[in-house]
């Protein structure tokens, strides 16, 4: 998807970034750091997983995206079938439908099971009945609008005493509320960050608008002080 947006064959891309059960989707964050794309919208959707297979299947192996497998951990723990991560839930269902192997199944949506002619073996198998995933829409250009109210950035801090404190206190001094902060290993493919063993980048979401001069001033200061800084986008919360 990132390559499609990069080469112009798609204007926008939509991908998951966080799940209420399994947490952050690390691959998405790594891709945001690697490519020069921007988040322009964000929304959240309740996800209902089911176990799907061909009629009469003797299920020994279950395929699905690794996030779906994590979200259904409790169900799978008691099912005693081998779990195999797959590209995504839809492709897992397609693979099961096209296979001659009658011992495999997929975790996917009921709609997907219907689409590929699979039988729903078990409905609502996610551990959390309110299992919800946040999705972002990305574009090649930033799309700041007057009603955008969340800004996402990532940065790598200098290895000096108090650097994290000094970064965080700036948000308080500017009256900007941080809604999320996560640290993660520096993506292997990120060449413009000087990487050391166990070095990390911080991903932050905070309330603000990129058209606000005070917000621009803060991000300018951070860009000057950090080892690495990247603006990831400004968008409306759950637009």
PLM feature spans:
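Domain-level signature for soluble enzymes in the chorismate/prephenate branch of the shikimate pathway
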Residues: 1-239
């Amino acid at each position: 998807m990132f390559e499609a947006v990069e080469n112009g064959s798609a204007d926008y891309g939509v991908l998951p970034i966080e799940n209420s059960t399994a947490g952050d989707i690390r691959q998405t964050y790594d891709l945001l750091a690697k490519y020069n794309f921007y988040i322009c919208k964000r929304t959240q959707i309740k996800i209902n997983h089911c176990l799907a297979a061909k009629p009469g299947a003797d299920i020994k192996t279950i395929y699905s995206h690794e996030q779906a497998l994590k979200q259904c951990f409790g169900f799978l723990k008691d099912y005693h079938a081998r779990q195999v991560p797959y590209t995504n839930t839809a492709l897992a269902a397609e693979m099961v439908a096209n296979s001659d192997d009658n011992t495999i199944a997929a975790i996917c949506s009921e709609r997907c099971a219907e689409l590929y002619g699979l039988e729903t073996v078990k409905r609502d198998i996610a551990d959390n009945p309110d299992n919800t995933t946040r999705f972002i829409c990305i574009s090649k250009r930033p799309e700041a609008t007057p009603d955008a109210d969340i800004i996402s950035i990532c940065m790598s801090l200098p290895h000096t005493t108090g650097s994290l404190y000094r970064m965080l206190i700036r948000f308080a001094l500017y009256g900007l509320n941080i809604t999320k902060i996560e640290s993660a290993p520096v993506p292997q493919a990120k060449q413009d960050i000087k990487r050391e063993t166990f070095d990390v980048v911080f991903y932050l979401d905070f309330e603000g608008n990129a058209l606000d001069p005070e917000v621009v001033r803060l991000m300018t200061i951070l860009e000057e002080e950090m080892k690495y800084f990247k603006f990831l986008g400004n968008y409306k919360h759950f637009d």
